[in-house]
Amino acid sequence: MYEKYKNSYKVTEKELVSLSVYNVGFQRCDSLYQWGPGIRDHYLIHYIISGKGFYRIGKRTYELQAGDSFLVYPNTEVVYYAAETDPWEYAWVGFTGSDASMILKATDFSPEKPIIRETPHGSDIHRQILHIYDARGNEFEHA
């Protein structure tokens, strides 16, 4: 049996810069744990470390599993929740800034395809989120 946990940090003041990390964390969820329906005011990438869950944006629901990633766009209503059996564990990074949308255009994410299925680069996404988490410094407060 595993023990659920949540560790997250966020910047208390958003600055008008080209790209800024807003929050970063990781969480092992209970069965059917849900966020939303809700709207974020920043971009938010989740990488599924283990388990399964669902991401709903508009009328589309995506079933996700370990190795997959999903992107929450700002000002868009979404819901995401852990599967009843084998609930997910994920890492995330939230970011904002004037160049955020331009940078995302260089990725495989798009409003029409807000998920990336398990790829050889999936572990790179996870590793980069963990690097950001490890480098959080003193500007973040525990959320």
Regions found by a protein language model. Give the residues of each.
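A short, N-terminal "cap"/entry segment at the start of jelly-roll beta-barrel domains
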Residues: 1-20, 135-136
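A general boundary/transition motif marking the beginning of the first structured unit of a protein
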Residues: 12, 91, 116-117
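N-terminal regulatory/effector-sensing and dimerization cores
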Residues: 16, 20-111
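Amphipathic alpha-helical segments enriched in hydrophobic/aromatic residues interleaved with Lys/Arg
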Residues: 102-143
